[in-house]
Amino acid sequence: MDEFHRCGKEDSFWQQCFLYPLFFQEDLYAISHDHYLDVSSSSRPMEHLSSNDQLSFLTVKRLIGQIRQQNHSIVLFVNCDPNPLADRKKSFYSESVLEALTLVLEVPFSIWSKYSVEGMNESKSFRSIHSIFPFLEDKFPHSNSILDARIPYSIHPEILVRTFRRWIRDAPSLHPLRSVLYEYRNSPDNLQRSIIVVPRVNTRFFLFLWNYYVCECESILFSRLKRSSHSRSLSHGSFPQRTHFHRKIKHIIIFSRRNSLKSIWSLKDPKIHYVRYGERPIIAIKGAHLLVKKCRYYLLIFRQFYFHLWSEPYRVCSHQLSKNCSSSLGYFLRVRMNPILVRTKMLDELFIADLITDEIDPIVPIVPIIGLLATEKFCDISGRPISKLSWTSLTDDDILDRFDQIWRNLFHYYSGSFDRDGLYRIKYILSLSCAKTLACKHKSTIRVVRKELGPELFKKSFSKEREFYSLRFSSKAAARSQRERIWHSDIPQINPLANSWQKIQDLKIENLFDQ
């Protein structure tokens, strides 16, 4: 495979035209067999992997023969073994086939994605988790509307094969892919009769399909947005020298192209900004309402004609930031005006100017958080704390540590919001639920538990936010951090609250359109 990568870098045409012979190499299936055992050994005991999951090169040769014959049942090729472990071995060899197929298809995709990213330097940022927070701080407040789009999961297998055909010229190499996709499509478990491409499936083959599918959508969509979004804006220009001011304004574009590092320069001001978190792209638009309608119409037509998908209107929602809030990352996102008083002294005169800037104001969704806590049996639907009965069998330290971890995750997750007053209501619910859980365990009351454990009960478990800042900042920075917003790049992995709350929001929107 390393040799194939090296040859592919030297001659991309050879790499695209001769993928099919790789399916006839026994080493490919040995590699996929080893990779499958490495993945499955973490979920199954080793004694189950010793005798039944051995690679048989005789079976591999039968598989290669069926590939040569272009048999459309290559996934179910182990059907001649009469022993009771046939179903399990069939699954084992099916996973090996999927691993081998993924290894072959990953080679052109990795090279193509590398060159496509090198050709579009602007598109590097929106594929990283670190692009979300600069987007929220810099692009979001200066936008008028937000398009909240959703990447469709269900897609016909032939559409996926055709998208691969655009980049892989070796048509026979796509026959195994077509066979696998149709085998999955026609399986009894698949009731929708389509390929469900989701990033949460813990299979290398489906993760590869998801990555390719998203990159294909973004490459086409980003190229279209790039053509129509960039424009020169005088509002972002800098004029240190005031001589011949009006003449410089007239020739701003000419000077900025030739001497961009001199006193007169202009910046690109894209009116359309794109970022993606998981499977939810967000498009921020700065312009008139007609531009928003055109972008929304383009997204619907793009899905309909390119992927042959009929998208419901609620799949692409538009929000005006001046009237509504947008929901993303578990926040309610809105824009507020921030007045700044500027005093300028020139000679003996003092000038005072009021500048109004727009900044993002993320709001902690208290009501949805209480609803999720009620689902997890920490409180009732009205927010009244109750005991966590399923934790009464644990030790006192384990109970305190679990409540402590929940609160630290919530406080850490919503540290990007200035207004954290609502979080203290969540803190009260968790602290009282912790006390009721301990009282239920010891068959006593909250007063007795607090008297026995002392006043350090709640201080031990719910005073970690001060330590959180003191460990990461100095004394001056810790005091300043209480007045500043702090984004943490690991918040999507800390708390599944954002995904679960977003699912609730999606169901509400779908039910609204179904009525």
Curated annotation (Swiss-Prot):
Give yes or no: UniProt keyword Magnesium: no
Presence of the UniProt keyword Coiled coil in the record: no
The domain of life is: Eukaryota
InterPro entries in alphabetical order? Domain_X (IPR024937), Maturase_MatK (IPR002866), Maturase_MatK_N (IPR024942)
User: One of this protein's GO BP terms?
Assistant: tRNA processing
User: Chief subcellular site?
Assistant: plastid
| One Pfam family in the UniProt entry | MatK_N
Could you list this entry's UniProt keywords, alphabetically sorted: Chloroplast, mRNA processing, Plastid, RNA-binding, tRNA processing
Q: Where in the cell is it found?
A: Plastid, Chloroplast
Q: Which GO terms describe its molecular function?
A: RNA binding
List GO terms (cellular component aspect).
chloroplast
Alphabetized PANTHER family for the sequence:
MATURASE K (PTHR34811:SF1)
Q: Which family does it belong to?
A: Belongs to the intron maturase 2 family. MatK subfamily.
Role, per record: Usually encoded in the trnK tRNA gene intron. Probably assists in splicing its own and other chloroplast group II introns.
Protein's UniProt name: Maturase K
Its gene?
A: matK
